[in-house]
């Protein structure tokens, strides 16, 4: 069973409170989402494997640790997921970036896939799927399905979001029990329009200044 973790680091919680405030404008919202994403990358990558390597310092030879195992690919769910990419690559600059485009039917609340572009070696990588909001879980489930259709395995996937609703967490866990889920905040519920309560509004609109 994959893990579900609410990242309670004080800086993450402080910055999440900042972007919940409806008075925060696009510039500060975008910058703070990037900062939270960098902090989340630290936590999401915590269990990446290490191996021993020989290093010669200016003083002596020594055995130290470096990353081993699979290289990373960051997969934002468009469009809002783009807001988390720069923060993630601050810590993992060599990561490749893939893209999965989704839009939500405002009547049915169902997601529709319109674009997929992934690195050629995607099946050989550890995948960090990012989307600021995990609401109904529909987009996350569809994104994971798209990756599985292309040969990726659940055990190599981690999903990271800023805010999650219990309904979305349940949907992903039931569909893909081996996918780890990380969130900065677990909120109360969804409202009748499918928005997270209390949430932070429409993350895409607030990131890009659209309506």
Curated annotation (Swiss-Prot):
Binding site for uracil: 196, 201-203
Cofactors demanded by this protein: Mg(2+)
Claim: Lipoprotein is one of the keywords in the record: no
Listed EC numbers: 2.4.2.9
Catalytic activity: UMP + diphosphate = 5-phospho-alpha-D-ribose 1-diphosphate + uracil
NCBIfam families registered for this protein in UniProt: PRK00129.1, upp
One GO BP annotation of this record: uracil salvage
Residues the record lists as binding 5-phospho-alpha-D-ribose 1-diphosphate: 79, 104, 131-139, 202
Species this protein is from: Limosilactobacillus fermentum (strain NBRC 3956 / LMG 18251)
Cofactor note: Binds 1 Mg(2+) ion per subunit. The magnesium is bound as Mg-PRPP.
PANTHER family: ADENINE PHOSPHORIBOSYLTRANSFERASE, URACIL PHOSPHORIBOSYLTRANSFERASE, CHLOROPLASTIC
UniProt pathway: Pyrimidine metabolism; UMP biosynthesis via salvage pathway; UMP from uracil: step 1/1
Protein name per Swiss-Prot or TrEMBL: Uracil phosphoribosyltransferase
GO molecular function, a single term: GTP binding
Similarity section: Belongs to the UPRTase family.
